[in-house]
């Protein structure tokens, strides 16, 4: 996983990574000849993951690092080379890039090199408008897009959530994977740990697990060319 939210990095906090542990960031790698392996942190043991592994590349979170990246940016060809090196050296099954919300250069660059674009959005007007714009950008880049609806108000039942998902799927002509309800426990847990690992029996954790399995299936089918999520296809909802 790469934290590419270069203007507001924060994944390192959720993973409990201290400043002292971060020697090299993705910023350093993209703006110099530093190899990507120097920025990789293996979180497998830290998070108690029994099967597989989780590797993480943090973004620079000091003010001078953020300002430098905003001012100079990074080269697309260098970014592609870094991703290729990371994927091949560690024999990755999947590479997740968490980018900045909204239309920023780093966001568009990450969309341009990815295989599948996953949008995460609340159902308020501002987020929906932004998701529509991002969907259009992905269309121009000819990238498959799926949408996850987040923080659905607790007053909205499961059937109503599904109807909302169907309407949005039809409006944007894309696949809505699921509608995640607002959960106060998740909200209170923000920036203090990985919820699904700390609350493994929680119903929402099961929903996240199903979502992850659906996403893996979508990515695999997209790579194999067996299933298309192009913008001219029939919109769908899952979950």
Q: What function would you assign to each model-found segment?
A:
Residues 1-3:
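Short beta-strand "acidic-cap" motif of Rossmann-like dinucleotide-binding folds
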Residues 10, 64-68, 188:
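A short acidic, helix-capping loop that chelates divalent metal ions and anchors anionic groups
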Residues 78-179, 188:
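Conserved catalytic-core segment of NTP-binding enzymes
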Residues 7, 62, 126:
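Conserved Rossmann-like nucleotide-cofactor binding loop
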Residues 7-56:
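Phosphate-binding loop that captures ATP/GTP phosphates
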Residues 29, 57, 98, 180, ...:
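Residue-level signature of catalytic and energy-coupling elements of molecular machines
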Residues 139-239:
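C-terminal lobe/tail of nucleotide-utilizing enzymes
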Residues 37-39, 46-47, 51-101:
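Cytosolic-facing regulatory segments adjacent to core modules
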